[in-house]
């Protein structure tokens, strides 16, 4: 799988203003609060991604949501707005380049009613068929819960109704899995 980053100008202003997520204007770092990660290749952006795929003879790729935009710990309205941005962005990539990309969409399990509405929107309005979920999430009490919690069965039931593929992204993998960060990378 891969990721496509939005151009800095595509990210809604509120996300940077609230320290939720942004990309520096020079495209060298993506940031969230005090966290930052270097953007070590220009092929995280659409034009360069397609050039890279052509160079390596990759016809079609699966693009997943950024784990930073799973919105863990975000207030409800920020979460709704952030997820809508991520899903609309991924849908635009899939719509503009349907022969090149299958893109995922994300929902936040903490806000289950919104999650169910967003699944409906992403499938019926945006044509997305790959649901991306975090392995665990922060509930309203600040506790980490597994996405496999029984209370979240409606998410999986709706995904099953729509025959969605589901990708579970491990959060904080380096804290849970004792593998060297040599042949793969936690992100």
Language model regions located:
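Helix-coil boundary/capping segments in enzymes
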Residues: 1-187
């Amino acid at each position: 799988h891969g990721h496509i980053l939005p151009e800095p100008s595509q990210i809604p202003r509120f996300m940077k203003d609230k320290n939720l997520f942004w990309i520096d204007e020079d495209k060298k770092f993506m940031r969230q609060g005090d966290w930052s990660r270097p953007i070590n290749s220009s092929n995280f952006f659409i034009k360069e991604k397609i050039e890279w795929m052509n160079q390596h003879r990759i016809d079609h790729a699966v693009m997943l949501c950024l784990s930073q935009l799973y919105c863990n710990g975000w207030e409800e309205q920020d979460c709704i707005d952030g997820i809508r941005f991520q899903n609309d962005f991924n849908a635009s990539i899939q719509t503009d380049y349907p022969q090149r990309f299958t893109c995922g969409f994300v929902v936040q399990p903490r806000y289950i009613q919104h999650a169910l509405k967003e699944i409906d929107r992403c499938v019926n309005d945006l044509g997305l068929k790959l649901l991306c979920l975090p392995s665990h999430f922060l509930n309203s009490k600040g506790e980490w819960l597994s996405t496999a919690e029984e209370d979240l069965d409606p998410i999986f039931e709706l995904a099953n109704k729509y025959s969605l593929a589901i990708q579970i992204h491990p959060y904080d993998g380096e804290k849970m899995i004792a593998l060297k960060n040599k042949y793969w990378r936690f992100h």
